[in-house]
């Protein structure tokens, strides 16, 4: 079928007038510029592997166990436990306020009798009396002195099996742990001038907030969590704990991440939302005393306001959801006042406001995440509406009010008369407010909510102030705008029709008679005979055929054919006939990316299978240069398409161009191709299978890749309608003559029809399998 379309393209049978070009341009702008639906309304997924990046948050998430940090000297923050985890005996840490307090902590190993040891404390070498009588517990000893040149005295001890100690500055005191684990508890020593007290640690340490003192006590008595004792936990410098404070601007653009083609931009904007309700009041026929409907309608509103000195043009669409229907009937007479239905929004209702403005934030609002908004509440109060009766005093509906509170924000698309806009949809929940509404001269009163009769109360608009923030994936080039879903409804209707037509086409495969299919495949089909089953005029068929040609010219198959044609043209311009024949083959082989290599290059059967598969996918184009009088896969595809077009009940002029171009690429995807050399046949399949066999006996022989490479360059490439497996199965079970074998190898339609008419199950099954592959 593709070759049929290809040959008619080459023959220039069809032309395009200016009206066709205008229609095509309009179709591109209105129907074909679409984005695949994504998780938000009419947006789509990004065309890259898009991670969430770093998320900014105003909440300080404080870890319970912060560390470990490398040994250092620093001013320990107030209200933080410094949990020290030494790995060797000796000095653990020391500190001072530089005036009247010097303190130091040392670690003593097991089984140490009362002895003097030498330590370097406060830059001086001192002798301290230490001991540890326990054979199972390590011992921390806290020493303190009150003068620069004074003597250290023992203050408290902590015996532990976990080699952990801790202290904290709080309320003018130094707190530490004392006792014996697992019953150690905190104690304190009075000190002054905590703000200038520096601490020097000789071991790794952790910081724990005072609010987690209970957990710190648990660590002292029972040890650190298992994760902290692995070799993968690496201490870091204390400087990594520094927090840099920054204040976000109300209106700013921040580059979150950036690659060569795309970047993530965070847009922070303060906005002013102005909106108004629209309503529809319909009066019934008759004497003029009855109304059939009072309802809310969507309302578009365009306005300008100033943001940071810049004039912003904004567009909003206000709509309601979850309305409540009320009725009023004053009596059965034609002159009795009555309202068949009037709408009221109450607590169970929602108001949606779609907002768009001309700022950079909305220019590429297609791929969006981290969307948040903060808006004010607004009170909407109803006004008076007089029902003009032919005679008598007018009933007046008055009052009613609701408060709109923000309930969320999502993405949406606004459709105006000229363009569709990717916008933000702000959702508001409602709460009823005073006053209630009533209708004068009736018993209807004391009802809460906002009726649709006069929801704007003569004000020009309602206004909400607030701000929003979002992160959008946009092109790195600021001059490029990401396409949005223009006229998406038109395209969706067409896609729905195409989907239904595809289902019908696929279901019709079982209704095709095999014998008639072979006859139809041998006919010289053209485009006009293809559409003979469609009720239409000749001019309509011409127009439809032109559209099919346009669709086909933009397909992947047509592009590959164009490359092949260029190669043939280059070869035809060669000087000698023999050179041109070789040029056709070599250029074609190059264009179709023939990756066949010889001998030593084919190390494994897997390599050969991959290369053969790549060649088989491209031999379809090579087949165009060697058209024969026998059947090809495209002949069967065209016959199946013709049969299904005749049987279809849903085909139309708008859908047939898509169906034909799609069929030319998708019908019979699992094809097998054959080249022959005297008594040897070579077959390759799309699935990577390949066979070489004797034609007279169908005995398989080794596949000569070098010979195959030469044959596909110089010899005709045939469609293997009846492939090697089917032929061998047929010969083994039924026995066939050499003449029949040659005709089946060449896909002779007469021989195929004879086997089908004789109900040969093997041949019928093969043809039915090909028909089943003609799917969309």
Curated annotation (Swiss-Prot):
Which segments does the entry list as coiled coil?
484-511
Q: List the disulfide bonds.
A: 318-380
Segments for region (Hydrophobic): 389-409
Domain of life of the organism encoding this protein: Viruses
The family database entries (Pfam families) matched by this protein are listed as: Rota_VP4_MID, VP4_haemagglut, VP4_helical
Q: From the record, which residues define motif YGL motif?
A: 448-450
Place the motif DGE motif on the sequence. 308-310
InterPro entries reported for this sequence? ConA-like_dom_sf (IPR013320), Rota_A_VP4 (IPR042546), Rota_VP4_MID (IPR035330), Rota_VP4_MID_sf (IPR038017), VP4_concanavalin-like (IPR000416), VP4_helical (IPR035329)
UniProt-annotated stretches for the region Spike head: 65-224
- Annotated Gene Ontology cellular component terms: host cell endoplasmic reticulum-Golgi intermediate compartment; host cell plasma membrane; host cell rough endoplasmic reticulum; host cytoskeleton; membrane; viral outer capsid
Site Cleavage: list residues: 231-232, 241-242, 247-248
Which residue ranges does the record annotate as region Spike body and stalk (antigen domain)? 248-479
Any one GO BP annotation for this protein: permeabilization of host organelle membrane involved in viral entry into host cell
Which key words tag this protein in UniProt?
Capsid protein, Coiled coil, Disulfide bond, Hemagglutinin, Host cell membrane, Host cytoplasm, Host cytoskeleton, Host endoplasmic reticulum, Host membrane, Host-virus interaction, Membrane, Outer capsid protein, Viral attachment to host cell, Viral penetration into host cytoplasm, Viral penetration via permeabilization of host membrane, Virion, Virus entry into host cell
Region span, Spike foot: 510-776
Q: Which SUPFAM superfamilies does the record match to this protein?
A: Concanavalin A-like lectins/glucanases, VP4 membrane interaction domain
Q: Which family does it belong to?
A: Belongs to the rotavirus VP4 family.
Further information in the entry reads: This strain probably does not use sialic acid to attach to the host cell. In group A rotaviruses, VP4 defines the P serotype.
* The protein's name in its UniProt record: Outer capsid protein VP4
């Amino acid at each position: 079928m593709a070759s049929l379309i290809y040959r008619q393209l080459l023959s220039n049978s069809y032309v395009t007038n200016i009206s066709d070009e205008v229609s095509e341009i309009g179709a591109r702008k209105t129907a074909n510029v679409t984005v695949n639906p994504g998780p938000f309304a009419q947006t789509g997924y990004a065309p890259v592997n898009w991670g969430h990046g770093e998320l900014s948050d105003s909440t300080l998430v404080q870890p319970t166990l912060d560390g470990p940090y490398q040994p250092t000297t620093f001013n320990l923050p107030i209200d933080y436990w410094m949990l020290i985890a030494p790995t060797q005996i000796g000095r653990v840490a020391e500190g001072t306020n530089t005036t009247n307090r010097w303190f130091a902590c040392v670690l003593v190993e097991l089984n140490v009798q009362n002895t003097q040891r030498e330590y370097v404390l406060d830059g001086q070498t001192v002798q301290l009396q230490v001991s540890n009588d326990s054979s199972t517990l390590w011992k921390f000893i806290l020493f303190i002195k009150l003068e620069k040149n004074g003597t250290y005295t023992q203050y408290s001890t902590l015996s532990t099996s976990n080699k952990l100690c801790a202290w904290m500055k709080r309320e003018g005191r130094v707190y530490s742990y004392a006792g014996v684990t697992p019953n150690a508890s905190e104690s304190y020593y009075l000190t002054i001038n905590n703000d200038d007290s520096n601490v020097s640690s000789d071991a790794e340490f952790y910081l724990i907030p005072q609010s987690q003192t209970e957990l710190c006590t648990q660590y002292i008595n029972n040890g650190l969590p298992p994760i902290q004792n692995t070799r993968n936990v690496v201490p870091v410098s204390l400087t990594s704990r520094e927090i840099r404070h920054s204040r976000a601007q109300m209106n700013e653009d921040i580059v979150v991440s950036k690659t060569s083609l795309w970047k993530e931009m965070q847009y922070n904007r303060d906005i002013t939302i102005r909106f108004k309700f629209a309503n529809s009041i319909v009066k019934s026929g008759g004497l003029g005393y009855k109304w059939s409907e009072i309802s809310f309608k969507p309302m578009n509103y365009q306005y300008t306001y100033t943001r940071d000195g810049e004039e912003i043009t904004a567009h909003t669409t206000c709509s309601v959801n979850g309305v409540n229907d009320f009725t009023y009937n004053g009596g059965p007479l034609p002159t009795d006042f009555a309202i068949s239905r009037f709408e009221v929004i109450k607590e169970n209702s929602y108001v949606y406001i779609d907002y768009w403005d001309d700022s950079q934030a909305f220019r590429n609002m297609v791929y969006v995440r981290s969307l948040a908004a903060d808006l004010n509440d607004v009170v909407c109060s109803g006004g008076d509406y007089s029902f003009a009766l032919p005679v008598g005093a007018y009933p007046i509906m008055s009052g009613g009010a609701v408060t709109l509170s923000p309930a969320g924000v999502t993405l949406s698309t606004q459709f105006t008369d000229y363009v569709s806009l990717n916008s933000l949809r702000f959702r508001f929940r409602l709460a009823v407010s005073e006053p209630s509404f009533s209708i004068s001269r009736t018993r209807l009163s004391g009802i809460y909510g906002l009726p649709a009769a006069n929801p704007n109360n003569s004000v020009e608009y309602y206004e909400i102030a607030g701000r929003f923030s979002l992160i959008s994936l946009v092109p790195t080039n600021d001059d490029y705008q990401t396409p949005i879903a223009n006229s998406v409804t038109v395209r969706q209707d067409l896609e729905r029709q195409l989907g239904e037509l595809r289902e019908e086409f696929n279901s019709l495969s079982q209704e095709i008679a095999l014998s008639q299919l072979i006859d139809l495949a041998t006919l010289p089909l053209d485009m006009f005979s293809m559409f003979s089953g469609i009720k239409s005029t000749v001019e309509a068929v011409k127009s439809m055929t032109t559209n099919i040609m346009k669709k086909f010219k933009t397909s992947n198959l047509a592009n590959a054919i164009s490359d092949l044609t260029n190669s043939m043209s280059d070869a035809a311009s060669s000087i000698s006939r023999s050179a041109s024949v070789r040029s056709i083959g070599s250029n074609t082989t190059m264009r179709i990316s023939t990756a066949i290599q010889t001998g030593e290059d084919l190390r494994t059967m897997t390599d050969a299978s991959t290369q053969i598969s790549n060649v088989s996918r491209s031999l379809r184009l090579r087949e165009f240069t060697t058209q024969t009088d026998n059947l090809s896969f495209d002949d069967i595809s065209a016959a199946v398409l013709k049969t299904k077009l005749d049987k279809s009940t849903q085909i139309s002029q708008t859908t047939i161009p898509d169906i034909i171009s799609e069929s030319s690429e998708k019908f019979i995807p699992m094809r097998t191709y054959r080249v022959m050399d005297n008594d040897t046949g070579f077959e390759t399949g799309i699935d990577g299978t390949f066979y070489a066999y004797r034609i007279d006996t169908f005995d398989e022989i080794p596949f000569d890749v070098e010979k195959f490479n030469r044959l596909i360059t110089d010899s005709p490439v045939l469609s293997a309608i009846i492939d090697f497996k089917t032929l061998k199965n047929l010969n083994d079970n039924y026995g066939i003559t050499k003449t029949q074998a040659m005709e089946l190898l060449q896909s002779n339609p007469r021989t195929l029809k004879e086997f089908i008419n004789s109900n040969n199950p093997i041949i019928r099954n093969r043809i039915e399998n090909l028909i089943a592959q003609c799917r969309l």
